[in-house]
Amino acid sequence: MNQQTTNRDTGEAAATNAPANSATSTSTPDNQPTPLDAFEVLLITGMSGAGRSHAADCVEDMGWYVVDNLPPKLLIPLVDMMTTSGSGSESGVHKLAAVIDVRSSYFDELAAVLGHLDDLGVKTRILFLDASNEVLIKRYESVRRPHPLQHGNRLIDGILEERHLLEDLKERADWVIDTSSLSIHQLSTKLYEAMLGSGPTTVAVHIFSFGFKYGMPIDADFVADVRFLPNPFWVPNLRELTGHDKPVADYVLSSKGAKEFLDAYEKAIEIALEGYAQEDKHYVTIAVGCTGGQHRSVAMSEELARRLRAHGLNVTVSAREQHKRHSS
């Protein structure tokens, strides 16, 4: 998935005439303001090449007003303008999404700006797009463009510098999405699930199966290892099937320890989800791994999803290694 460049208002011009030191909504009979506690700000950030621009497109489709490469110091004047002018109320837009990267001016002021927005009662969330160094290198090489922090050095040097600069922001993020193995369509789906699939007291759950032989996932909140179960790969009539097929699912789920593991894991997940909802975390990723990601992990992922859906949870399932076959 190559990051596409989009052209939007940069926000500087929009904020030029906004009061710089006030974000207090005022009202006139013909021009009603948007209350600050009804206004939302989303920061879209992350590694260059990880899909920020596509994420911005998706967020725009969800009804957010999107501004590209906005210097953090202009966030408050822009929010002030959109709330005090009444333009937000007239247009029905109460949500501002700003794409911010390390090239934005005064990036180090972002923490103070976020604190100010919190003090004003503006709901502010952070979406962080990430990808492995290897994938970022391949994406940059495919488009033959330099990294914004490369400065004539090696591509990996620019990537590592950016990763270091974004460490604190990643820690503060409400959503961290790793796009290393995602297509544009899969990223869109994941964004919609994360941002629209949950309410203020519910948590959207995404479960995916994977193979340990292809690497550990880096974006999972929970990782379950089901390699303790008998491997259908070594059963001749099951080898060419996957955990989506009933014979494999029956074999895996009837194995010694499968039910006991699912019972315990289901209970642990329920407890964690209740806590996450209280902490305003609305999206949880569960990875279930076996050796090759074809049999045991797929069957167990589907069964875990079925159980969680029975509790009324919004659960989606995918198989990371679905295009890889003949693997245990």
UniProtKB/Swiss-Prot annotation:
This entry's Gene Ontology molecular function terms read: ATP binding; GTP binding
- Give the Low complexity compositional bias ranges: 13-29
Question: Sorted alphabetically, which InterPro entries does this protein's record hold?
Answer: P-loop_NTPase, RapZ-like, RapZ-like_N, RapZ_C
Q: Which Gene3D superfamilies match?
A: P-loop containing nucleotide triphosphate hydrolases
Q: Which residues bind ATP?
A: 46-53
Pfam families documented for this protein: PapZ_C (PF22740), RapZ-like_N (PF03668)
Cite the residue spans of the region called Disordered.
Answer: 1-35
Residues holding GTP? 101-104
NCBIfam families attached to this UniProt entry: PRK05416.1
Function text: Displays ATPase and GTPase activities.
Annotated family:
Belongs to the RapZ-like family.
The record ties this protein, via PANTHER family, to: RNASE ADAPTER PROTEIN RAPZ (PTHR30448:SF0)
Q: What is this protein called?
A: Nucleotide-binding protein BLD_0430
Q: Which organism is it from?
A: Bifidobacterium longum (strain DJO10A)
